[in-house]
């Protein structure tokens, strides 16, 4: 999912399309190989500026811009 000027809208769209437990491909950075994992929470807005989600086996939250549904 790409960055969005309105993170609340990004979170709402993500949560309506992808329930908790959805498999995603996560990239730590753009050149990294994707890691297949699953969401463990609904997406949330972090610090009023970034849409994030928590993933199984990953420490901390991850920006939705680093995740693609599998």
Predicted regions and their residues:
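Mixed-charge, Lys/Arg-rich low-complexity intrinsically disordered regions
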Residues: 1-20, 30
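Basic/aromatic-rich interaction segments and small domains that mediate binding to polyanionic partners
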Residues: 23-69
